[in-house]
């Protein structure tokens, strides 16, 4: 259930479809924690939908926590028509379009082999017993039968190859003659059975959280770096990291995907086991003031601070600790302006001093050039002066104090 709505954009999300469509739900006594997530969005304007009808998709996801049981969340949030998924499987990935022998498990939905997901809805599979180690890659395969789909739900920038093949071949050890996908379609999460002390961090952000310009298929986003560090820390190995970044996303207004304010319930409160929230968002709100295409682009620091405070306050109401991350430098980026830089510096001062957040993660200080604080340290700049490269993401993930997640 959605627990609180913030902002002015109402995003209809139904997390449990009716039993008439999906059958029985999972046992209420089972406790779960999210181990992987991707924030759903409508296929972006200018990007052609892929006609996934009569195709098998094999999507590769990198989980954080391991577990003995797992369940997979499928989504039709932005669909205009019911979405039927059948012959779904989960296995350990063997790299590329192959799966590890002996690890393939069929997924069911209320005991059935297929599910019909209503427009606007998301559903979990039944739990399946698969021993998945932490920080492993899962291959989630499913067949999309011939059907009318006027709109598709996906996560645009996966930074991870997935695969599509003709026909129903979801159980195949290798997808032969598969095409490569750069997005995740119809998937939004994986939960694992919660071990003692299991809890989750949500990283809410834009392309810098999504991992733009990091090496593909290498899991070098800053949330990945944080997740790997946690697994090496005594007492914190059961803390997972859920990446809810969307490239181009904003705090206040829709641009690429729903705004941070409007997707807060779905991407934070509806995730299982969330105890901590890291918010790194606002640079796109600021950047678009330099190339305004409408009144929604005309914002000031006070409005952005208000939006961030709304997110923090709503999380606090649900017992979630909130860590504010300062906005990284963007001098030299295509939408840089002196006015925008003044706004970024003001928002960062507010993040550091307002007391709204339980703690501050100073990504600005970690990544900036000491000789010119408006710009990235050249060693961390991917080259577009807006995003870090692998070294920058490593510095960000390594610069987070793990003590923030001890209680």
Report residues per predicted region.
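Oxyanion-hole/transition-state-stabilizing segment in secreted/luminal serine hydrolases
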Residues: 214, 246-302
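Structural recognition of the beta-strand scaffold that forms the well-ordered cores
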Residues: 71, 200-205, 209, 239-245, ...
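Bacterial N-terminal signal peptides
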Residues: 9-19
